Every structure is written in C-alpha cells, then in structure tokens.
Amino acid sequence: AIFIIIMLIFKSISLPIILVAVIEFAIMVNMAIPFYQGTSLPFVASIVIGAIQLGATVDYAILMTTRYQKERQRGRDKMEAISIAHKTSMPSIISSGLSFFAATFGVACYSQVEMIGSICTLLARGAIISMVVVILILPAMFMIFDKVICKTSIGFLGGKK
C-alpha cells in the first residue's frame, strides 16, 4: 500500500522502490539487533515494529524526496538539489525522530508490562535508526539513481504532468 501511495504521489516507478528499500533496510537493521544479541521478542513485535517504523520512516523519506524533487524542478543539478534537500529537511527529520524516540523510550522505561516495554524499546531504537538511515543513505540513493528517477518519473524535472 505504501508503495502504491508513493508511486501515485510522485508519479514514479523508481521512487517507491528506492524509498521502500531504504525504509525496509532501517527496519531490518532494527530487527537484526535483538537477533544478534540473542534477545527473544514478543510474538507480535515484528508486525508492530514493521508497521509503526514504516509509518514513521516514510514521513521522513517523503519530506526529503519532496524537497529534492522541488530543487530538481528549479533546475538545480543533482548534487546541489540533494545538498539543499538534505540541509532543509534534516532539522524536521531530527526533531521528529528524537520526539518519537523520547516518547517510546519514556514508555519503555516506565512500563510495568514486559511486552509493552520490549516493543517500545524496539520502537525507540527504530526511531533513531530510521532517522540516521534517511539522513545518510537516502541522499546517497538519490545521487546514485538520479538519472533513473528522472527517466521513470512523470514531471520530475518540471516538464509535463
């Protein structure tokens, strides 16, 4: 569903693939940590974490992608567009990510229910991982796949829509 929404919003075939891949990478990193630590998770953890972290991270990714597209439409080259998108969206991504972290970490610390504490710990860590991945990896994906994005997106550079 997220793939289709991104595809319709950006009128692109490649952007949903790139954004969902970056988001899923952040989720996999988050879920891999307890595995490698040998920590057991509640049976619903992967479903809950996948859904909530996906929802939070897609906002960060859409924010940066929208700004990147706007800068490309203004005629900026890919490096300048990525740099501006990165600088302008980073404060919002960081404040949103840290707020999400603080809320879930607070619940994890004070929850008396083990399942809630465990899931909120994963969500808190996922907020930080997602924030870092969108800030560091998504701009690199824009740099690598700029030509593909421009060719597989309708009106990405400001042409016909």
Regions found by a protein language model. Give the residues of each.
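Hydrophobic transmembrane alpha-helices and their membrane-interface caps
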Residues: 13-65, 152
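Hydrophobic, glycine/alanine-rich multi-pass transmembrane helices and their short helix-loop junctions
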Residues: 3-7, 28-40, 90-157
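Transmembrane helix-bundle signature of multi-pass membrane transporters/permeases
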Residues: 49-56, 85-89, 123-127
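Helix-loop junctions and hydrophobic alpha-helical segments within the transmembrane domains
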Residues: 72-95
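Juxtamembrane/interfacial segments around transmembrane helices
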Residues: 42-53, 68-76, 141-156
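Residue-level signature of transmembrane alpha-helical entry/exit and packing/kink sites
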Residues: 15, 19, 47, 80, ...
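Short alpha-helical segment immediately N-terminal to, or the first helix within
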Residues: 6, 67-74, 108-109
